Design a protein with these regions (language model features):
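Mobile, glycine- and charge-enriched loop segments
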Residues: 2-17, 158-160, 167-170, 174-176, ...
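Generic hydrophobic/aromatic pocket-lining and core-packing "Φ" positions
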Residues: 28, 114, 157, 161, ...
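Oxyanion-binding "anion nests"
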Residues: 211-231, 254
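Enzymes and membrane/adaptor proteins characterized by extended Gly/Ser/Thr/Asp/Glu-rich
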Residues: 33-153, 175, 180-193, 222-234, ...
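Preference for extracellular/luminal or secreted protein segments
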Residues: 1-37, 248, 267-361
Length: 361
C-alpha cells in the first residue's frame, strides 16, 4: 500500500472539522485526500442572524459537499449538542438547558433533541455526558453532568441515551474514565486526577457501566492523567485504561473515540512520532480533529495522518490492530442512518421550546 493509500486509510479512523459555512480549498483538499469517515460541526459551520430556511439550505449544501469531496455516501455527521452552553446551532433549534437541570425530563428532552438533529442531517450526538459533578471547582464539566452522585448521573445519562436511541441518533458516553472531579480544563492543559482504580470503580465508572449495559455504541476518552493507574500517559493513550478497564473489565465492545486531538492536553504529544500507534494499541478506534481551537491547523491533521502511515510502514503500528479498529467503525457505520436535511414544522419547534422552559420551572 502506498503512502497516499495509507493516508487515506487513516480517514477510516478520522472525524474531521470543517472551517466554515462552506468548503474552502483546504477543506476540499483534506476531504479528498484523507477521506475522513466523519465530520464534526461547530457554530462556525452554521450561518447565524439569518432566517431558518436560509441557514438550513446553506448547511444542507455543506453536508452535500462533504460527501462529494470525501467520496463517501455514508459518513458520521456529528455534533456536540448537550444543551446549556454546548449548543452549536442557530435558532429556532431548541436551546435546552444543561443536563443538570433536566432531572426527570432527560428522556423527553433527548427525544426532542434527536428529532431536531435528524432534521439537520446529523446522525451522531457527542452525548450524554457520563461524568459526575463531584468537584464544585470543575471549570469544564460542572452542570454539563446529569448529577453529583453516581446514581443521579447514571439515571440522567441512561434516560437521555434512551431518548436519543429511540429516535435514531447514535450517542456517545463521555469522558472516559471520568472528567467530573478535575479542577483544570483539558482544552487548556492536562488535568491530573490522583484516583485509584478502586476509586474509579466506586464512583466514576458507574454511569459508564450503566450506558454499556444499554449497549451505547461509542465511548469518548478523556485527556486526563491518572498517575495511580497509568503514570506515563493520559487516558486517551493508556492501554490500562482503555483496554484493561474499558474493554476487559467493563465489557465494552463498541467504538472508542478520542476527544479532540487539538486540545492542549494532548496536542503536543500527538505531534510526536509514534503517538498515533500508541493510541491505536491502547484501544482507540476513531480520532476527532476539530480544527476549532486557536492552535488548530490542517498541517497538524496531515502530520497525524503521516505518523499513522509511517508507523504502519515501519511496523511499529500493528496492522491487525488497525484492521480490528476499522472493522468496529465500519460495522457501526453500516447501521448508522444517513438523514436528509429537512425543515421542522412550527408546531414541533414551539412544543420543544415549551419543553425546554418546563425544565427550568
Amino acid at each position: 500500500m502506498s503512502i497516499s493509500q495509507l493516508s487515506q486509510s487513516f480517514g477510516n479512523h478520522l472525524i474531521l472539522g470543517i472551517s466554515g459555512t462552506s468548503l474552502n480549498d483546504d477543506d476540499k483538499r483534506a476531504l479528498n485526500e484523507l477521506k475522513p469517515i466523519g465530520v464534526i460541526f461547530f457554530a462556525k459551520n452554521f450561518l447565524d442572524g439569518v432566517p431558518y430556511p436560509v441557514w438550513l439550505e446553506k448547511f444542507k449544501t455543506l453536508i452535500d459537499e462533504v460527501r462529494q469531496y470525501s467520496e463517501r455516501d455514508s459518513i458520521f455527521t456529528t455534533l456536540d449538542h448537550e444543551g446549556g452552553r454546548v449548543v452549536r446551532t442557530p435558532l429556532p433549534i431548541t436551546r435546552f438547558p444543561y443536563a443538570y437541570l433536566l432531572q426527570s425530563h432527560a428522556y423527553e428532552v433527548a427525544k426532542a433533541t434527536a428529532l431536531e438533529l435528524k432534521s439537520l442531517g446529523i446522525n451522531v450526538s457527542w452525548s450524554p455526558v457520563a461524568d459526575i459533578f463531584s468537584n464544585p471547582q470543575n471549570p469544564i464539566i460542572g452542570s454539563r453532568a446529569f448529577g453529583n452522585t453516581p446514581q443521579t448521573a447514571s439515571e440522567g445519562a441512561r434516560e437521555y441515551y434512551r431518548g436519543l436511541r429511540e429516535e435514531g441518533i447514535l450517542g456517545s458516553a463521555k469522558h472516559f474514565p471520568g472528567h467530573g472531579d478535575t479542577s483544570t480544563d483539558s482544552h487548556l492543559e492536562l488535568p491530573i486526577l490522583n484516583l485509584s482504580r478502586e476509586d474509579l470503580r466506586n464512583r466514576e465508572l458507574i454511569p459508564f457501566q450503566t450506558l454499556i449495559q444499554l449497549q451505547i455504541p461509542l465511548i469518548m476518552t478523556a485527556h486526563i492523567l491518572f498517575p495511580q493507574i497509568d503514570p506515563e500517559v493520559p487516558a486517551t493513550l493508556s492501554k490500562i485504561i482503555l483496554n484493561d478497564i474499558l474493554r476487559k473489565e467493563l465489557g465494552f465492545e463498541g467504538v472508542i473515540v478520542s476527544d479532540d486531538l487539538d486540545m492542549k492536553a494532548v496536542s503536543e504529544i500527538f505531534m510526536q512520532s509514534g503517538t498515533v500507534a500508541r493510541a491505536f494499541h491502547a484501544g482507540c478506534d476513531l480520532f476527532i480533529v476539530s480544527r476549532n481551537i486557536n492552535s488548530s491547523s490542517l498541517e497538524r491533521t496531515y502530520k497525524i495522518a503521516e505518523d499513522f502511515s509511517a508507523s504502519l510502514n515501519n511496523g511499529s503500528l500493528d496492522a491487525g490492530v488497525v484492521e480490528a479498529a476499522r472493522e468496529r467503525v465500519e460495522k457501526l457505520l453500516r447501521i448508522t442512518p444517513q438523514y436528509p436535511v429537512s425543515t421542522l414544522d412550527k408546531e414541533t419547534l414551539v412544543k420543544n421550546a415549551e419543553l425546554g422552559i418546563s425544565c427550568c420551572l
